[in-house]
UniProtKB/Swiss-Prot annotation:
InterPro entries xrefs: NADH_DH_suC, NADH_quin_OxRdtase_su_C/D-like, NADH_UbQ_OxRdtase_30kDa_su, NADH_UbQ_OxRdtase_CS
Keywords attached to this entry: Cell inner membrane, Cell membrane, Membrane, NAD, Quinone, Translocase, Transport, Ubiquinone
Family listed: Belongs to the complex I 30 kDa subunit family.
Catalytic reaction list: a quinone + NADH + 5 H(+)(in) = a quinol + NAD(+) + 4 H(+)(out)
Principal location class: membrane
EC number: 7.1.1.-
Protein's recorded name: NADH-quinone oxidoreductase subunit C
Topology class, membrane: Peripheral membrane protein
Assembly information from the UniProt record: NDH-1 is composed of 14 different subunits. Subunits NuoB, C, D, E, F, and G constitute the peripheral sector of the complex.
Function: NDH-1 shuttles electrons from NADH, via FMN and iron-sulfur (Fe-S) centers, to quinones in the respiratory chain. The immediate electron acceptor for the enzyme in this species is believed to be ubiquinone. Couples the redox reaction to proton translocation (for every two electrons transferred, four hydrogen ions are translocated across the cytoplasmic membrane), and thus conserves the redox energy in a proton gradient.
Main enzyme class: translocase
PANTHER family xref list: NADH DEHYDROGENASE [UBIQUINONE] IRON-SULFUR PROTEIN 3, MITOCHONDRIAL, NADH DEHYDROGENASE UBIQUINONE IRON-SULFUR PROTEIN 3
Protein location: Cell inner membrane
Length: 204
């Protein structure tokens, strides 16, 4: 781990690299994502993209829960004090890379614009990014430039919005049911009320 960290610092700089829980996270600007990923693949042998996802930091450090978060168990968390200013940028794309030959992993994080969340596709670098990028587009609304087939992959064809965004209502916008009179599936405005049942916590 230390040898990899030293080599990465020499190439990308110390300020862009963070080590936490025996994992390395490299943060790069969205305009440099292709150049960075090529270096990681060609010079550091990160030949496999094992995961890609979008992250929405809109409500990071905030809570709708009035009680205290548990100090143990599944809902354990830490204080929200001082967390509101950690992420000024809202959307990030996170890549998890694996070097099979060296048995090393690294996380790459790149923030994108909130109004126009666009970043270049890495499908030409790792073919496995294809459906991952489609999923991030579908659920988070992040656009991947030069992706050859960027369409929804999980939600319905007529779905409106991106359901993993923090400002998307938890109850959804519409509900679907089968109408016996019309003999077809119909969409109606959602009929349930929103309710916060569990505390929002930040895992230790």
């Amino acid at each position: 781990m230390q040898d990899l960290k030293t080599s990465l610092v020499e190439v990308f700089g110390k300020t862009n690299l963070v080590e936490s829980f025996d994992e390395l996270t490299l943060t790069v600007g969205s305009q440099n994502i292709i150049k960075t990923c090529l270096k990681l693949r060609d010079f550091f042998s990160f030949d496999t993209l094992i995961d890609l996802c979008g992250v929405d930091y809109l409500t990071y450090g905030q809570s709708d829960w009035n009680g205290n978060a548990s100090a143990s168990g599944f809902s354990r968390g830490r204080s929200h004090q001082g967390l509101k200013d950690i992420h000024e940028e809202r959307f990030a794309v996170v890549y998890h890379l694996l070097s099979v030959s060296k048995n090393k992993r690294i996380r790459v994080k790149s923030f994108v614009d909130e109004v126009e969340p666009i970043i270049k596709s890495v499908t030409d670098i790792w073919a496995s990014a294809d459906w991952y990028e489609r999923e991030a587009f579908d659920l988070m609304g992040i656009l991947f430039e030069n992706h050859t087939d960027l369409r929804r992959i999980l939600t319905d064809y007529g779905f409106t919005g991106h359901p993993l965004r923090k400002d998307f209502p938890m109850i959804g916008e519409v509900e679907m049911r089968y109408d016996e009179d019309l003999c077809r599936v119909i969409y109606e405005k959602v009929s349930i009320e929103p309710n916060v049942n569990v505390p929002r916590v930040i895992r230790k």
